[in-house]
Amino acid sequence: MTGCDSLTDSKVWMEEVGKARMAFALFLTIQALENIRSFFVLTEEGVFTGIVEEKGTILSVGNGRIAIQAGKVLEGTKLGDSIAVNGVCLTVTTMTKNQFTADVMPETLKRSSLGSLKKGDGVNLERAMAADGRFGGHIVSGHIDGTGIISKTENDGNAVWVYIKASPVILNLIIEKGSIAIDGISLTVAKVNDVEFAVSVIPHTGKETTLLEKKTGDIVNLENDVIGKYVQKLMGIKNAAGSVSQAERDNKLMDWLRG
């Protein structure tokens, strides 16, 4: 075999591997979507889209209960319905025309930013999506994966870059141009490295949500793309504290292809 033949074979092989990766990714995505659909149908869990409907105001937090002033999200809402508060799915326990309360477990307060909220703080609110609702963002379960810390913000024309430091467990599932929910807001990741990621916030998002009201050092709730989490599980890659190498992902792919 000549060197040219070897090079050609190598290119063909790489093209075939690329096609196999795409086919495998499609297969995993379909499986993930089916699992997600089954989960929400069987458990009757609420599902959100990351499109914030309004900004509410904290009235009180304490004794395992949170009270929030709101308006739009209470339209058509009944006791027992789900509302995402800064990305955390809570169940409405009492309500009036312009406010509602929800019970919050101590563990939820500890693992999310809800525990640091105080009277007068703004929060992002979204009702669970109706079965015939329009899907504007991405699938958000309301069960956050952890929190991040805003490390810096930078103005860029009419947009604002927001940089967020997060744990390796969360960063391991973040990809550029992928989706992530930050305080319940569906956003696209523009940059990511080993310690932080960044999103670009347009004026409309800044106006309709609380994100640009945050300052450096503030804590935000983070939920990775649920499809990515299902794909990772289907591939058998544990979301360990360290990043998973591309070589390991390739090995998983080839093992699956060999059957």
What are these regions (language model features)?
Residues 7-10, 28, 40:
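Short hydrophobic targeting helices and cationic amphipathic motifs
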